Swiss-Prot record:
Belongs to the ArgR family. One of its GO terms (cellular component) is cytoplasm. Its main location: cytoplasm. InterPro entries: Arg_repress, Arg_repress_C, Arg_repress_C_sf, Arg_repress_DNA-bd, WH-like_DNA-bd_sf, WH_DNA-bd_sf. It is found in: Cytoplasm. Regulates arginine biosynthesis genes. GO terms for biological process: L-arginine biosynthetic process; protein complex oligomerization; regulation of arginine biosynthetic process. The keyword DNA-binding applies. The keyword Oxidoreductase does not apply. This is Arginine repressor. NCBIfam families: argR_whole (TIGR01529), PRK00441.1 (NF001680).
Length: 150
């Protein structure tokens, strides 16, 4: 079911300019698939869909290009090789890297499109990530630690 839904989503966004999850859910329903907004939201994450500016000047869902996917994988590798420690203080995540690597590691974090990140800033060897809640910060730390096998 999920595979056929994912296939249909990719077909829909390639044929039409879909701007919202609600529009996508409606298109799926028109094709005979019963979906909720939560399901569509998960599908968008799993398919790693992004929003791009359409020729009409509005944002629409699109697939990530192979080049961007390749770059994202490279950044994750760089992250795993340069991060020394990931810690949390309240709703702030602190990532320590080897000297000169914080910007590349921060770019890797950005490429993950993690939910709940309000913003981040990178220095030479430290990244501060402001999350929207302590629970979100905890989840971010867990995900980042998995990436460095900690």
């Amino acid at each position: 079911m999920k595979v056929s839904r994912h296939t249909k989503i990719l077909e829909i966004i390639n044929l039409k300019d879909i701007e919202t999850q609600e529009e996508l859910a409606e298109e799926l329903r028109r094709s005979g698939m019963e979906v909720t907004q939560a399901t569509v939201s998960r599908d968008i994450k799993e398919l790693k869909l992004i929003k791009v500016l359409s020729s009409k000047g509005r944002y629409k869902y699109a697939t990530i290009s192979p080049t961007e996917s390749f770059l994202s994988n490279k950044l994750v590798t760089i992250f795993a090789q340069t991060v020394l420690n990931v810690d949390r203080v309240n709703n702030m995540v602190v990532v320590k890297t080897i000297s000169g690597s914080a910007n590349a590691a921060a770019e890797a974090i950005d490429s993950l499109n993690l939910d709940g990140i309000a913003g981040s800033i990178a220095g030479d060897n430290t990244i501060f990530i402001l999350s929207r809640s302590e629970e979100t910060a905890f989840n971010i730390v867990q995900k980042l630690k998995k990436m460095i096998n900690e």
